[in-house]
Amino acid sequence: MSVKPSWGPGPSEGVTAVPTSDLGEIHNWTELLDLFNHTLSECHVELSQSTKRVVLFALYLAMFVVGLVENLLVICVNWRGSGRAGLMNLYILNMAIADLGIVLSLPVWMLEVTLDYTWLWGSFSCRFTHYFYFVNMYSSIFFLVCLSVDRYVTLTSASPSWQRYQHRVRRAMCAGIWVLSAIIPLPEVVHIQLVEGPEPMCLFMAPFETYSTWALAVALSTTILGFLLPFPLITVFNVLTACRLRQPGQPKSRRHCLLLCAYVAVFVMCWLPYHVTLLLLTLHGTHISLHCHLVHLLYFFYDVIDCFSMLHCVINPILYNFLSPHFRGRLLNAVVHYLPKDQTKAGTCASSSSCSTQHSIIITKGDSQPAAAAPHPEPSLSFQAHHLLPNTSPISPTQPLTPS
């Protein structure tokens, strides 16, 4: 969550669009706000802001408590087993760290929405909190893409070099994702400022003369990097993996194929509504013209859509960890480890393989070394069930500037 999309020259709450000819006489934000103050409403939508704040407060609080517990458990269990980490554990561990970062930012967004976007935590935290959120949002999505690609490559690759260097590749990919995610938000964050007033607000404040261009560039980059590029990759590689695993007449195979399709469906349900709303509000007034009732509804429900997009940090631990019997075994071992010694025997695993934390869909090669006579050995597959969902709260569009 962050600053809401700017209405630019379009209508905000109870305000009509201003003719373009009138905007030619406007030279700064103060004059623009003054013009909107004297513009009459053409339509009015009766919506309860107080009810929305209560609902959002409850949702944010629930996501914070559940997400904090889930992601801490995932990190602890995977960290303890990092020495003998499974096929996808490095990506899962990093994704849990990114999701935990989003969860830790939820109290700030919860209070900001409750206080009607009044920012009480100073100028530094205004920028840092948004930057911290964006970094973790992009990281979570990118690690999800890597999981989808790596799963298919591991399933289909018989190359000895891949078997030898796959862990190095994964470490390099994880480091690269964190660096890339730290760079991507910078153009937006440098324009986020604390606007002082009776009720200080944390807003996206690009130069007035190029504000519409900046707002559109930020919205497009968010949608492209956060959805339009990850979505095809996640879809294609999960579908290819499902086709590879499909075995007619095998109920377990069908279940795992449906699970792979569920990964894609959850990602779409989390992020598509957010990015559609973000683009519509950003384009309105400058590139497209929306009916004022629709604009009112989009602004009103933007906070709710933004909140639901953050559900990925609560659902990811369930889909990629808790639905896996292997993870539950490791979690039980971790709990038993801290119990009195005379109670630990009942919780120990029969073998190390049964305790290893793996992705809900586990892909292993039949032989560690490819046979000379069989350059393309058939993979041996074992599965555990689970679901998916991506990030972020989303990168919020620029907030409508409504006078106090």
Swiss-Prot record:
Disulphide-bridged cysteine pairs: 126-202
All ranges on the Extracellular side of the membrane: 1-57, 114-127, 194-217, 281-299
Keywords attached to this entry: Cell membrane, Disulfide bond, G-protein coupled receptor, Glycoprotein, Membrane, Receptor, Transducer, Transmembrane, Transmembrane helix
Record-linked PROSITE patterns: G_PROTEIN_RECEP_F1_1, G_PROTEIN_RECEP_F1_2
Cross-referenced CDD domains: 7tmA_GPR182 (cd14988)
One GO-annotated biological process of the protein: cell surface receptor signaling pathway
Residues that span the membrane, as ranges: 58-79, 91-113, 128-149, 171-193, 218-239, 259-280, 300-320
Annotated localization: Cell membrane
Topological domain ranges for the Cytoplasmic compartment: 80-90, 150-170, 240-258, 321-404
Entry GO MF terms: G protein-coupled receptor activity; transmembrane signaling receptor activity
Keyword field contains Membrane: yes
Name of the protein in question: G-protein coupled receptor 182
Lineage: Eukaryota, Metazoa, Chordata, Craniata, Vertebrata
